[in-house]
């Protein structure tokens, strides 16, 4: 990422009923800077964590790196791709886990979501079994693979979300 920035146009709300009506027909916008001139390099295989207060731009930056948001300024290259072009070769090699988003089907056992990911990503049976076994052992969730996701504790669900995000061995 080089001088990565994201600026949103946010509607300014006017008080009262008359203000709400005016906002409906003639909204007023102000600029909200979410990310300002962020630059960094992450080498392949390097683990990185984003920490900071609410509103610091962590999620916005991750969304730009994954191609979910187009930056207002700067440039990004992730494994040799422009993320917002959403190329298949790029998408099959990344993963993003966010606390509010679920990859697991709520009404099915976690293993069914993993099996679906296997088919979506075209993972061979042998590679899938090896990766699944490694992740399940590392995260110690073997005893809950066949439990309906809605019945898992938050910790168990987060571990299962990690398995779903990593099952295709993203770069």
Specify the residue positions occupied by each region the protein language model found:
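Pre-NBD coupling/linker segments of ABC/ABC-like ATPases
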Residues: 2-34
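Helix-to-loop junction immediately C-terminal to a conserved catalytic motif
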Residues: 66
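Conserved ABC transporter NBD signature motif
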Residues: 74-85, 90-91
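Conserved ABC ATPase "signature" region
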Residues: 17-24, 115, 119, 126-144
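Hydrophobic anchor residue at the start of the ABC signature
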Residues: 162
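A short, proline-enriched helix->beta-strand linker immediately N-terminal to the Walker B motif
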Residues: 167-171
